[in-house]
Amino acid sequence: MGRGLMNSLKPYLAMISMQFGYAGMYIITMVSLKHGMNHYVLAVYRHAIATAVIAPFALFHERKIRPKMTFRIFLQIALLGFIEPVLDQNLYYVGMTYTSATFASATANVLPAITFVLAIIFRLESVNFKKVRSIAKVVGTVITVSGALLMTLYKGPIVDFIRFGGGGGGGSDGAGGSHGGAGAAAMDKHWIPGTLMLLGRTFGWAGFFILQSFTLKQYPAELSLTTLICLMGTLEGTAVSLVTVRDLSAWKIGFDSNLFAAAYSGVICSGVAYYVQGVVMRERGPVFVATFNPLCVVITAALGVVVLSESIHLGSVIGTLFIIVGLYTVVWGKGKDKRMTDDDEDCKGLPIKSPVKPVDTGKGLAAELEMKSKEGQEAKATTTTQVEI
């Protein structure tokens, strides 16, 4: 029973753990970008490191189960490598520098709704409004998106969860200095373009989930697929960077926060994340994976206050409550879906017993006719005796 409970909890624990990993990435990359790291170069280094780390595991563990590569699968992997590692992440990096780390993670909270709609369009998800579980998925998604929009569109008064003293020690070197004066004015100026980039990034992320789900059905080797996505992302990202980044000094990297940002985001948020979400996706579907993303904004907001000295507004607090309620509503509906699917599979596995008639070999029929003949003769004899009397 204990082992069965742990197996049922694994998908939930895996996705919650990944949100902590993503939250750390939001903060670390924000610091790296503020220290002058080029976002195109960061994306290339990130996936180069992820490829180098994951490739040995893929070569060893999946050497006997790796499917044959076809041209169609190769095109899908190439598209996956462009959508998430190149397009998605660069839109995110630019959008985050124009807004904030908390806002960047908040706009990603519409990911469950977009993924849900795309999953219905591509028949990866079904909705039956006569079923409570389907209504729960729809209502939960709406609540989650409402919370995300509330965090995005309404700030409200600042809520001081943690009060920092003095504020004089921040200096110009660090994250705190960018929030004052000219830095705040520049951020307000680019807020709308940054928001559009972050929303475009979210659509790309949802499309990545859907395409990854289809690709896993044809190429069911999660480690190998992760390695190939990161490799294609590295190659395609390098091609884009060579065109957009003319200053070769931008490629220089030392043992500093920039290298740490590339290594952390590459190993945790690309290598491990692609693999984990692939494993969970094969069992629970892309909507289940996307549903946990709103938890990241709560973690990021807390880290943003402590690490980046960002402010928490009332809209973020109320939006967080909406997100949590919506998240658990969707998870409840998906849990019911999984239970119904398991019950259907169990029923299919049971042997079907039907009443079997004995095979008539001819002897049974003859015996039955003989018995009826004897009964008829006895009845006739009895009638004759009564008449004689």
Swiss-Prot record:
Molecular function as annotated in GO: transmembrane transporter activity
Keyword Transmembrane on entry: yes
Region (Disordered): 339-361
Compartments it resides in: Membrane
Record-annotated membrane-spanning stretches: 13-33, 40-60, 73-93, 102-122, 142-162, 191-211, 225-245, 260-280, 287-307, 312-332
Chain ranges of the EamA domain: 23-150, 205-331
Keyword field contains Nucleus: no
Keywords carried by this UniProt record: Membrane, Repeat, Transmembrane, Transmembrane helix
Pfam families per record: EamA (PF00892)
Family: Belongs to the drug/metabolite transporter (DMT) superfamily. Plant drug/metabolite exporter (P-DME) (TC 2.A.7.4) family.
Name of the featured protein: WAT1-related protein At1g21890
Species the sequence originates in: Arabidopsis thaliana (Mouse-ear cress)
